[in-house]
Curated annotation (Swiss-Prot):
One of its GO terms (biological process) is proton motive force-driven plasma membrane ATP synthesis. F-type ATPases have 2 components, CF(1) - the catalytic core - and CF(0) - the membrane proton channel. CF(1) has five subunits: alpha(3), beta(3), gamma(1), delta(1), epsilon(1). CF(0) has three main subunits: a, b and c. The gene is atpG. Pfam families: ATP-synt. GO terms for cellular component: plasma membrane; proton-transporting ATP synthase complex. It is a peripheral membrane protein. This is ATP synthase gamma chain. It is found in: Cell membrane. One of its GO terms (molecular function) is proton-transporting ATP synthase activity, rotational mechanism.
């Protein structure tokens, strides 16, 4: 058992840490609410764009590159990580999944290109001497479409130029406050479901100019929207996991404070008992 001074010092430092983690928990909770609201507000836009694609692509046998599968000679991996830690296993889970999938496919560095969001992911691959084709650090906690536009444009350009034949996004999918799932989903080429699962409310309309020209405009916009919507979802997951991590840290700190307080009281009681014993012993010796 440590001295009273040591125990008291630990109690004070733990209380300060507890205050910090509680504050971070509250901040993460506020950011989570905003992230969920942003994601919900963006969904109607994607639904309308989905309907437009359904109406156009559903009435034509389009050979648009974004709708046609081709032999995969090189894959694109768009990895969404965070710019800072203290979010539990948020980064470790998704980065481990990327490496695992690459290894299971037996891919060499020449078989894929990495696009990485977040400093943690960028440093992760850099420390392993794995080349990153495009890096986007400092992603805002509440990203706007403009703030992530560089990476969406880069991903689409790589696909349209034939530098990659498939684009996959790796992210932590937000399920609820207590659960997130490391997820990989293919974005390009768009699946038949992506091109035909809308409501098709514009199917009775005539389109000007021709449908292929319209697809050339709205398909890239739709892919940009898919990427942006995924980033919004990943941000919600990040805030939720950080909120949970900080709550757990606060709970652990409270438990530690209780244990240290018990140790302090016992040590103080032992010291008092020792002093009384010494006084009694001294008095007895004087008799």
């Amino acid at each position: 058992m440590g001295s009273l001074k040591d125990i008291d010092s630990r109690i004070k430092s733990t209380k300060k840490m507890n205050q910090i983690t509680k504050a971070m928990n509250m901040v993460a909770s506020s950011k989570l609410n905003k992230a969920q609201r942003n994601s919900n507000q963006f969904k109607p836009y994607m639904d309308k764009l989905q309907n437009a694609i359904t109406a156009v692509a559903g009435q034509t046998t389009s050979n648009h590159p974004m709708l046609v599968e081709r032999p995969v000679k090189k894959r694109g991996y768009l990895v969404i990580s965070s710019d800072r830690g203290l979010a539990g296993a948020y980064n470790a889970n998704i980065l481990r999944k990327v490496l695992q999938d690459i290894q299971e496919r037996g891919e060499n560095p020449s078989d894929y290109k990495l696009l990485v969001l977040g400093k943690v992911g960028i440093d992760f691959f850099k420390n392993r001497s794995i080349e990153v084709e495009y890096a986007l650090p400092d992603v805002p906690d509440q990203p706007t479409f403009k703030s992530i536009e560089p990476v969406t444009k880069k991903a689409i350009d790589l696909y349209e130029n034939g530098d990659i034949d498939e684009l996959n996004i790796y992210y932590n999918k937000f399920i609820n406050v207590l659960e997130s799932k490391p997820t990989a989903k293919r974005v390009l080429p768009l699946s038949k479901e992506d091109a035909s699962s809308g409501l098709g409310q514009m199917s009775s309309y005539e389109f000007e100019p021709d449908k292929e020209s319209i697809l050339n405009i709205i398909l890239p916009q739709y892919v940009e929207g898919l990427i942006y919507g995924t980033i919004l979802n990943a941000k919600a997951s990040e805030h939720a996991m950080r909120m949970t991590a900080m709550k757990n840290a606060s709970d652990n700190a409270s438990d530690l404070i209780d244990d240290l307080s018990l140790q302090y009281n016992r040590a103080r009681q032992a010291a008092i008992t020792q002093q009384i014993t010494e006084i009694v012993g001294g008095a007895t010796a004087l008799e």
